[in-house]
Amino acid sequence: LKFIELANEIAHQNTVLLQTTMGAVAVTEQAIVNEAHRRGMIVPGRKYRDKQAEPVTAAGAYVATPKKGLHDWIGSIDINSLYPSVIRALNMGPETIVGQLRPIITSAEVNRAKSQKKSFAAAWDNQFGSWEYQAVMNKEKGTEVLVDWTDGTSVRMSAAQLYDVVFEANNKWMLSANGTIFTYEFEAIIPGLLKRWYAERKEMQRKMHDAGDNEIEKEYWDKRQLVKKINLNSLYGAILNPGCRFFDMRIGQSVTLTGRCITKHMGAKVNEIIGGKYDHVGQSIIYGDTDSVY
């Protein structure tokens, strides 16, 4: 499989030591630093991390309960690069966060589930966004939310009012399913890096295809497109690792919960097309996992 050649290519493309390629965090971190420097920007120093603090956990991907039995004519729909696409779609980056819905209701619901001896993952079963986010998207006038802005101020308003502030006013803002508000006035570094990696991989795949019967050239481009694939698939997990310089729970959970909403909609729409009912656990859906439905 030529792992040493692959590791060498990863090291050169991301300017890290060969031994650093054995993990994803340091490689991804250096790639983001390189992208910032390419834009003429300076990256802030690493934040102090209290090793004695309790580990933080983000809500994971949606995994449906499979419908048991022998099924005929099964089809699958898979979203291409779900997590990188979510990061790009909402322009997620530490520098584009405008505010955060304080998860008061969400924390209460999760703690209530834990008091019933449920796991953290079980507390999020059939929940496709924070409770505050759902209230905003439902334009609930009777539900009050608290927004913590990045300038240090906080404001209370109804969920319906916040919907208008984010989506109806002239603010260039987007709201993730985690209740994190991002601006799209400028492109964040991480989404820009993902965009470049994705475009470069497509170009390398094209050159690999155009190589025809030239096996040496095909192998050359195949190795390089594989590096881009590894970079793309590694980034989300790396930035959700507390050891990463760019770790931010708001971004990590924004990715997973927004991904949940997309997968839920995909399953519900597929069931509607086949069975006539918009329902993500409808009769036509037998399973779903992270970025796919069956």
Residue ranges and their predicted role:
Residues 271-281:
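Short secondary-structure junctions
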Residues 34, 94-186, 191-192:
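Charge-dense polyanion-binding interfaces
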Residues 1-94, 100-101, 107-108, 112-114, ...:
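Common nucleic-acid-contacting/processivity interface regions adjacent to the catalytic cores
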Residues 2, 6-12, 37-41, 88, ...:
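Generic surface-pattern signal
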Residues 201, 232, 282-294:
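Catalytic palm active-site di-aspartate
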Residues 166-244:
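Active-site cores of enzymes that catalyze phosphoryl transfer or operate on phosphate-rich substrates
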